[in-house]
Curated annotation (Swiss-Prot):
GO biological process, one term: SOS response
HAMAP family: UvrC (MF_00203)
Database matches in NCBIfam families: PRK00558.1-5, uvrC
Lineage per the UniProt record: Bacteria, Pseudomonadati, Thermodesulfobacteriota, Desulfuromonadia, Geobacterales
PANTHER family listed in its UniProt record: UVRABC SYSTEM PROTEIN C, UVRC/OXIDOREDUCTASE
InterPro entries registered for this protein in UniProt: GIY-YIG_endonuc (IPR000305), GIY-YIG_endonuc_sf (IPR035901), GIY-YIG_UvrC_Cho (IPR047296), RuvA_2-like (IPR010994), UVR_dom (IPR001943), UVR_dom_sf (IPR036876), UvrABC_protein_C (IPR050066), UvrC (IPR004791)
Cellular compartments per GO CC: cytoplasm; excinuclease repair complex
Gene3D superfamilies: 5' to 3' exonuclease, C-terminal subdomain, GIY-YIG endonuclease, UVR domain, UvrC, RNAse H endonuclease domain
Gene name in the database record: uvrC
Disulfide bridges in this chain: none
Protein name per its UniProtKB record: UvrABC system protein C
Function, as annotated: The UvrABC repair system catalyzes the recognition and processing of DNA lesions. UvrC both incises the 5' and 3' sides of the lesion. The N-terminal half is responsible for the 3' incision and the C-terminal half is responsible for the 5' incision.
Species in which this protein is naturally found: Trichlorobacter lovleyi (strain ATCC BAA-1151 / DSM 17278 / SZ)
Domain UVR intervals: 200-235
Pfam families in the record: GIY-YIG (PF01541), HHH_5 (PF14520), UVR (PF02151), UvrC_RNaseH (PF22920), UvrC_RNaseH_dom (PF08459)
Length: 604
C-alpha cells in the first residue's frame, strides 16, 4: 500500500504524528486537531514550500499517537521534539542567559536578589534582563528608592551594628529594629508596584502616607515619604511608556528557505525593558513554528508575562493559553493585534526579526567565502566547516592541562569545548601530553558521538605538526582529520629598533617543507588565528584556575583555626574555593565555627 493510501485509515481524532525515513530516523514530529486531515495536507499538490518537498521526498512511513485533547497533543509533541530533535522541526540556537529579580514575600523582611532562572517556588520574579549588569542596575535603582535589606537575613542578624548601606540611606536596618515590620512591608509593596509599572497606585499611596504622617505631626516619617516620592519621580522621568501598564512579550517572526529569526520585545510595567533575537532552522509551517517556539522558550523556566502579542493566529492558540496559564498560575492571553499601539509593537518586533535575519544571512555568506578560500589555500579535501584546535598549558610540569575548542561554520561551538587534566604524562613532555589529550578526544566512543572534525589546527611550527601526525598515527584511526599547524609571527631583528617589524604568521601542511603564507589581513588567516588564540585562552584559564585553587587551599590551611573539617564546611556553603574568596566577611561568618575575627582572617 502506498503511503498516500495509508493516510485514509488515519483517525480524525487529535494526536501526534511522526514521519520517518527508510532507516527509521524521525524526520518530523507534528500535532493535529484532526490527524487524517492534517497529514493528508502534506500530499496536496498546492503546497509548494521547498521544505515540505524535501521532507516528503524522504518520508517512507508515518506513525501516529491518538490523544484525548489537542492540549495533550501539544504537550506530547513538545516532549518528542526534545527527545528526538528531528531535522525538519524548529531547531533554535539560544546561547543567551537571562536574569531576573526574585523576591520571596513569605520571607521575614523580604529582599530582592538577581537570579539566572525562574523557578516554580512561589516567589515573585521580575524581568527578564539581558545581562547580569542590567539586572543589577535595576536592583541598585530600586534600592536607592526603597531601602530594603541587601544581605541574607542570617548575616544581618549576626551583625553588631547596622551595615554601611544603612549609613548611606539605602537600607532601613530592619535587623536592628530601626523600622517596623508594617513600614518595611509598605516599602516592599511599593517596590513590587514599581516593577509592575503601577506607578499611579504607587505614587498616590505614598502621597497619602506622607499626608497622614504630616497630619499626625510625625514629621520625620513624612520627610522619609517625601524623599521617597522625589526618588520615584526622578526615575519615572526617564522611562518611556509604550503601553498602559502590565507585562507583555511581543513576538516577531522572519524567515527564508534556510533559516529564521524570532524577535522578542519585553514590556514590563508598560515600559520597553529589553529585547532578544533567537535564530534557528527547520519548521514547515509558520503557525506550528511559532507554537513550538513558545513551548521551547517559556517552558525553559522563563518569566511568563500576562500576555503575548503575536504576528499571526495559532491553530493551537487555546491549548497554549491553557498551558501557559498553568505554568504561571494565573491567566495568560495570546493576542494577534489588528490595529493600534499593540499592532505597532508587533510590527516593531517583526522589523527587528527581519533586520537580524538579514544580518545573519550576510554574515553567513562571508563565512562561506572564508571557508572556501581556506579549503583552496590549504588544499583541504573538504570544506572545513568543523575546525578543532588543541593547546597544552603547563608550568614546569605542574598543573598541566590540555584544551580543545571547536568552531562550526566559523563560529565557536562552546558545547564541544573540552578541558583535559593531564594525569599520565610527567614533566615537560609536550608530546606525551598531546598524546593523552588526543587519545581521549579521538577514542571510539567520542568519535561515534561527535564524528571527526574537518580540520585540526595546532599551535606551532613543523615540529608540532609532525608530533601531532605521529600521535594520530599511533592511535590507529581508520580515518584521520586534516591537520595543519599555525606558527605565530616573531619580531624581526633584535627588537631594539623603535619601528618593530614582525614576520608573517605561517601555516605548515603535512608533506610540505615550506609553509603557506596567507595575507595578514586575509579572512582565512584571521579565522585560524582566532581559533588558535581561543584554544590558548581556554587552556591558560583552566591552568590558572587549578594553580590558584591549590594556592588558596594552601593559604586556607595556614590560617589558625581552619582545619580540614572547617574547610569542608566552607566548601559546602560556598561551592568552591572561588566562592569562598568572593564571599563577604558577613557571609563567611554565617558558617558554623567561623567567628567575625576568623572571617576577617580568611578574607585578609
Amino acid at each position: 500500500m502506498e503511503l498516500r493510501d495509508s493516510i485514509r485509515s488515519f483517525p480524525t481524532a487529535p494526536g501526534v504524528y511522526l514521519m520517518r525515513d527508510a532507516t527509521g530516523t524521525i524526520l518530523y514530529v507534528g500535532k493535529a486537531r484532526n490527524l487524517r486531515q492534517r497529514v493528508s495536507n502534506y500530499f496536496g499538490a498546492t503546497d509548494g514550500r521547498p521544505q515540505v518537498r524535501f521532507l516528503m521526498a524522504r518520508v517512507t512511513s508515518i506513525e501516529f499517537t491518538i490523544t484525548d485533547t489537542e492540549k495533550e497533543a501539544l504537550l506530547l509533541e513538545n516532549t518528542l521534539i526534545k527527545q528526538h530533535q528531528p531535522r525538519y522541526n524548529l531547531n533554535l540556537k539560544d546561547d543567551k542567559t537571562f536574569f531576573s529579580l526574585r523576591i520571596d514575600l513569605t520571607e521575614r523582611f523580604p529582599r530582592f536578589t538577581v537570579v539566572r532562572k525562574v523557578s516554580r517556588d512561589g516567589a515573585r520574579y521580575f524581568g527578564p534582563y539581558a545581562s547580569a549588569s542590567a539586572a543589577r542596575e535595576v536592583l541598585r535603582q530600586l534600592q536607592r528608592m526603597f531601602p530594603l535589606r541587601h544581605y541574607p537575613l542570617k548575616t544581618c542578624l549576626n551583625r553588631s551594628r547596622p551595615c554601611l548601606y544603612h549609613q548611606i540611606g539605602q537600607c532601613s536596618a530592619p535587623c536592628h529594629n530601626l523600622i517596623t515590620a508594617e513600614e518595611y512591608n509598605l516599602l516592599v509593596e511599593g517596590a513590587v508596584l514599581f516593577l509592575e509599572g503601577k506607578n499611579k497606585d504607587l505614587v498616590s499611596g505614598f502621597r497619602q502616607r506622607m499626608k497622614e504622617a504630616a497630619e499626625g505631626l510625625h514629621y520625620e516619617e513624612a520627610a522619609r515619604w517625601r524623599d521617597l516620592l522625589k526618588a520615584i519621580d526622578t526615575t519615572l522621568e526617564h522611562q518611556k511608556m509604550v503601553s498602559q501598564g502590565g507585562d507583555s512579550d511581543i513576538l516577531g517572526l522572519a524567515g527564508n528557505e534556510d533559516s529564521l529569526a524570532i524577535a522578542v520585545l519585553f514590556v514590563r510595567g508598560g515600559s520597553l525593558s529589553g529585547s532578544t533575537v533567537l535564530h534557528g532552522s527547520g519548521g514547515l509551517d509558520t503557525s506550528d513554528t511559532l507554537a513550538t517556539f513558545i513551548q521551547y522558550y517559556y517552558g525553559n523556566e522563563r518569566f511568563i508575562p500576562d500576555e503575548l502579542l503575536l504576528p499571526l493566529s495559532l491553530d493551537a492558540g487555546q491549548s497554549l493559553e491553557e498551558w501557559l496559564s498553568e505554568l504561571k498560575g494565573k491567566k495568560v492571553r495570546l493576542q494577534q493585534p489588528k490595529r493600534g499601539d499593540k499592532l505597532n509593537l508587533v510590527n516593531l518586533a517583526t522589523r527587528n526579526a527581519q533586520a537580524a535575519l538579514a544580518e545573519k544571512s550576510a554574515t553567513r555568506q562571508g563565512i562561506e567565502r572564508t571557508l572556501a578560500e581556506l579549503q583552496q589555500k590549504l588544499a583541504l579535501p573538504r570544506l572545513p566547516r568543523r575546525i578543532e584546535c588543541y593547546d597544552i598549558s603547563t608550568l614546569q610540569g605542574r598543573h598541566s592541562v590540555g584544551s580543545g575548542v571547536a568552531f562550526l561554520d566559523g563560529l565557536p561551538d562552546k558545547e564541544r569545548y573540552r578541558r583535559y587534566r593531564i594525569r599520565e604524562s610527567q614533566g615537560q613532555d609536550d608530546f606525551g601530553m598531546l598524546q593523552e589529550v588526543f587519545a581521549r578526544r579521538f577514542s571510539p566512543e567520542r568519535i561515534e558521538q561527535w564524528g571527526l572534525p574537518d580540520l585540526v589546527v595546532v599551535d606551532g611550527g613543523i615540529g608540532q605538526l609532525n608530533s601531532t601526525l605521529s600521535v594520530l598515527a599511533e592511535l590507529g584511526l581508520s580515518e584521520r582529520p586534516a591537520v595543519v599547524s599555525l606558527a605565530k609571527s616573531r619580531v624581526k631583528g633584535d627588537g631594539k629598533d623603535i619601528h618593530v617589524e614582525r614576520t608573517e604568521e605561517r601555516v605548515f601542511l603535512p608533506g610540505r617543507r615550506n609553509p603557506v603564507r596567507l595575507r595578514q589581513d586575509s579572512a582565512p588567516l584571521k579565522l585560524l588565528a582566532a581559533i588558535r588564540d581561543e584554544a590558548h585562552r581556554f587552556a591558560i584559564g583552566y591552568h590558572r584556575r587549578l594553580r590558584d585553587r591549590e594556592t588558596l587551599r594552601s593559604a586556607l590551611r595556614e590560617i589558625p583555626g581552619v582545619g580540614p573539617k572547617l574547610e569542608r564546611l566552607l566548601l559546602t556553603r560556598f561551592g568552591s574555593l572561588e566562592g569562598i574568596q568572593n564571599a563577604t566577611v558577613e557571609e563567611l561568618a554565617t558558617v558554623a565555627g567561623v567567628s567575625q575575627e576568623l572571617a576577617r582572617l580568611i578574607k585578609a
